[in-house]
Structure formats: structure tokens, C-alpha cells
A protein has these predicted regions:
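Domain-level signature for soluble enzymes in the chorismate/prephenate branch of the shikimate pathway
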Residues: 1-316
Length: 316
């Protein structure tokens, strides 16, 4: 079949012809259960045939080259990296862990600014938080990945141990207000519930919260952040760790606008839109089975055209 289509310039998929054949096969029985079973069986046979045809066309060079370039390794030394927040932020720590302590990195106020920096060529890579083991996904990052033509090329898992940061000499009795990122406040909610008289105020970044406490020089204010943030802003670690999940970690993704992947990559993230019809997701997931991949996560998102985001890893 593939040889015929190569020779005659035919497309692999002829949807109308497949539907016609399935209708003919379904009409061989009057039983609705058997009809459905026969059609599903031959749908799978046709799908397997198409996958093999696409593979053969690729081997013959008919279907074109893969749009992503394979590279040996990301050059982590000769590049500019952007992250959201200020020095001492968890994103800053993740940046230094992935790109090295001498990384040529700079910070911007928002995650969107990170994406814009890549788009405009000001930065080669951005380091963005995408999920936390306690608080879940960072939905705004998924929205930005959908909006911008940027691609995930790596990840950094950062163990998160939140600390209560205050001016040197601050006692717990003096505290009236605690500042931090909403997720950090959530991850420390059990600890904060023991201090119900403390007002919780959200800021855009844990390190920015530390910076505010340092600049205001008010002992009634504290921040939740990293010990590194305390060091950068001259604060004292009053208590640590205060997050209730002692295995708390955040996954940061390394994003670029270049279509490339490392030779030893074993994870792929895919975002796609499906019609709201029976079997549409089922048919897409068949590609994961066919290519011997193990799906470790799937997420359905509402409000953006029924977007489904999946992540798969190659089976060992």
C-alpha cells in the first residue's frame, strides 16, 4: 500500500474512503453490538496500517524531515537565560542548578516577560515553574506555552524547603503580616493555621516578598521563601522548614524558541486540540502505544478549545 502511494503521489489518509469501507463492514451484521465491534476492529487495523505507511514514507524521504533538530547537548555556558522574580527566587536557584553557578542570567517581573525575551532574541532560554508536588500545575505557564511558539528542551526538579524569613532578631510574637507567593502560602498553610492572627498577603514571587520585608525594615512583617533569598536580602531564617509536605518539589521547564531536542531526551510534552466527538482522544492515544511510549501524565483543559496536554516518557 505504501509503495503504491509513493509511486502515485497519494496521501496516506483518505478519510472518506475509510468511512465508506467501515460502513460496508458494519452493514454485514444487523446486531448493533457486533456492528460496533467490527467497525472498531477494522478502525484499529486501518490505523496501524497508516502508521506503518507514514513510517515507510519517512524512510523513503517522501514525508519530509522532522521539524526538530537533534543536538548532542544544550550549550549551557554560552547562552543568556531569563527567569521571573529577583535574585534568591526559586526560579533563580533552578537556573543556577541547570545552567551552572556562573550562568549568564537575568530576571524579569512576569512569566510573560520571559516568553517575550525569548521571542525577541534577548534570551536564549527561559526557566519557568510548571508544577509543584503539593500545589499542582501552574496553569498560567500552560497558557503561555499554548500562546507562544516556544518549546520545552529540558527540566530541573528543585526540592523546596520554605523558610520563615524576617529581620535579624525578629521574634514570632512580633509578627503580624506574612508575604509570599500564593503557592508558597498554600504549601505552608498547616504552619500558618497555627498562627491565625497573622495576615497572609500574596505577592508575585517569594524572593520579592523577602525583598519587601528587607526594604520596609518592619519587624511585624515576614516572608516565606528560600534560605538563599534570606542571604541575598540580609534577612534571618526564623523557622525552617515550614511547608507541611517534607517531599515538596517544583518542576521547572527550560524553554527556547528553537525546535531542537537533546540526543538522550526521554520525555516529550505534547499539546493538541481535539474535536468534541466520541473516540477522538482514544485515537490519538493509540500513537503512544504504537510507539512504545509510557504516558506518565494527561491533563484536559477547559476554556481553550478543549486542549489536552499529555506527557510521555520512553519505556526503559
Amino acid at each position: 500500500m505504501a509503495e503504491y502511494k509513493i509511486a502515485n503521489g497519494k496521501k496516506v489518509l483518505d478519510r472518506a474512503r475509510e468511512l465508506e469501507k467501515l460502513e460496508t463492514l458494519g452493514n454485514l451484521t444487523n446486531d448493533s453490538f457486533n456492528r460496533h465491534g467490527i467497525q472498531e476492529l477494522f478502525q484499529q487495523i486501518m490505523a496501524m496500517s497508516r502508521k506503518l505507511q507514514y513510517q515507510l514514507l519517512a524512510e523513503e524521504g517522501v514525508s519530509g524531515n522532522l521539524p526538530f533538530t537533534r543536538i548532542d547537548h544544550i550549550d549551557r555556558k554560552h547562552c543568556r537565560v531569563v527567569y521571573q522574580g529577583v535574585e534568591g527566587a526559586y526560579a533563580h536557584e533552578a537556573t543556577l542548578q541547570y545552567f551552572g553557578k556562573d550562568a549568564n542570567a537575568f530576571h524579569v517581573p512576569t512569566w510573560r516577560d520571559c516568553m517575550e525575551a525569548i521571542k525577541e532574541g534577548v534570551a536564549d532560554y527561559a526557566v519557568l515553574p510548571i508544577e509543584n508536588s503539593s500545589a499542582g500545575e501552574v496553569n498560567d505557564i500552560y497558557d503561555l506555552l499554548e500562546e507562544y511558539d516556544n518549546y520545552i528542551v529540558g527540566e530541573q526538579i528543585l526540592k523546596i524547603n520554605h523558610a520563615l524569613l524576617g529581620l535579624p532578631g525578629t521574634s514570632l510574637d512580633e509578627i503580624r503580616t506574612v508575604y509570599s507567593h500564593p503557592q508558597a502560602l498554600m504549601q505552608c498553610s498547616v504552619y500558618l493555621d497555627k498562627h491565625s492572627d497573622w495576615q497572609r498577603i500574596s505577592l508575585s514571587n517569594t524572593a520579592m516578598a523577602a525583598k519587601k520585608v528587607a526594604e520596609d525594615k518592619d519587624r511585624s512583617q515576614v516572608a516565606i521563601g528560600s534560605p538563599a533569598a534570606a542571604g541575598y536580602h540580609g534577612l534571618e531564617v526564623l523557622e525552617m522548614p515550614i511547608n507541611h509536605n517534607r517531599f515538596n518539589s517544583t518542576r521547572f521547564i527550560i524553554v527556547t524558541n528553537r525546535k531542537m531536542y537533546e540526543a538522550d531526551a526521554k520525555k516529550v510534552g505534547i499539546c493538541f486540540e481535539l474535536p468534541h466527538t466520541s473516540g477522538s482522544l482514544y485515537n490519538i492515544l493509540s500513537h503512544i502505544i504504537y510507539n512504545d511510549l509510557n504516558m506518565c501524565k494527561i491533563e484536559s483543559r477547559d476554556g481553550h478549545g478543549n486542549i489536552v496536554q499529555t506527557e510521555t516518557t520512553v519505556t526503559e
